[in-house]
Regions:
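Internal catalytic or translocation cores that form aromatic/hydrophobic pockets or channels
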Residues: 89
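Boundary detector for helix-to-coil junctions that initiate low-complexity/charged tails
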Residues: 1-67, 72-76
Length: 276
């Protein structure tokens, strides 16, 4: 053991760049192992539940998913977009009434998929600041604050490494144009883009059939849950985009549903909350 330590010290002294490379390799290996554990856990969770919508996606919806990913309008993988589309297609198949909501849309890709999956007459509201997201609070963990430091420093990147959506000059216009380009124009397809902070804009008084929440932090997630969960119809779903990603979102969800009955959790690739 002593000889091995001496050898390592000599190696560090003779080749410091080798030691730095070794540390970086070990760091990457640890990261890869964490990702593998997470992927395995997500796969096990997904196996516990049948697909929300077991039928093949309509061709138009499948093409929309491919198109928004091709244009890098979303951070979501194809399977996640298929899951969102399936939730809405099931509502249409089963005749479940209610508005479709997306809170936090970034470049609009997932909202465009939801709009393509729903009937044109079903109302849909898309809430976002359409700019840089607000800062986290003391209820968020260190992971969230580190992420926001990156965003605030101007170092965040878009889905393909391009300009981060929060730095765009006129994101609202870009999202509106993307809806039209993909065949679901806002004014003609029952979609309304609502600009502003969630606490100022989410004030519905009608049944909610489905909500995709992508608010990242604690306060935004808690606001969405407090305003939308009581309106969720029987069989309706809330999909939490960031439950497995950011501590603030996870804390808000766990706190909100801790003493509330009538909801069940489905731990799929993302958390689904279903109203009984």
């Amino acid at each position: 053991m002593q000889l091995a330590r001496i050898r390592r010290r000599v190696a560090r002294w003779l080749a410091p760049e080798y030691e730095q490379e070794l540390r970086e390799t070990r760091r990457r290996l640890r990261t890869a192992r964490r990702r593998l554990r997470k992927a395995r856990a997500e796969l096990e969770d997904a196996r516990r539940y049948p697909p929300v919508f077991p039928e093949p996606l309509p061709e138009r919806v499948a093409q929309t998913i491919e198109a928004v990913r091709g244009e890098r309008l979303t951070y979501l993988k194809a399977g996640m977009l298929e899951d969102l589309a399936g939730c809405v297609l099931r509502l249409e198949r089963d005749g479940v009434a209610g508005v479709v909501v997306e809170a936090g849309t970034a470049l609009g890709g997932s909202a465009i998929v939801l709009a393509a999956a729903k009937a044109p007459e079903r109302p849909m509201k898309v809430y976002d600041v359409f700019g840089q997201i607000p800062p986290p609070s003391e209820r968020d963990g260190a992971d969230v604050h580190r992420r926001y430091e990156t965003i605030a420093a101007g170092a965040a990147k878009g889905p393909g490494g391009e300009t981060y959506y929060g730095y765009r000059d006129d994101l609202y216009r870009e999202v509106e144009e993307s809806f039209a380009r993909h065949g679901v124009p806002v004014g003609e397809h029952g979609v309304e883009l609502v600009r502003g902070l969630f606490e100022d804009t989410i004030r519905l008084d009608e049944p909610v059939a489905f909500a995709h929440l992508d608010g990242d932090w604690y306060e935004s997630t808690m606001t969405c849950l407090a305003r939308l969960a009581p309106l969720l119809v029987s069989g309706g779903r809330i999909v939490l985009d960031d439950y497995y990603t950011w501590s603030g979102c996870r804390r808000a969800v766990d706190e909100y549903f801790a003493d509330r009955e009538g909801f069940r959790f489905e731990r799929r690739t993302r958390l689904h909350v279903v109203r009984d």
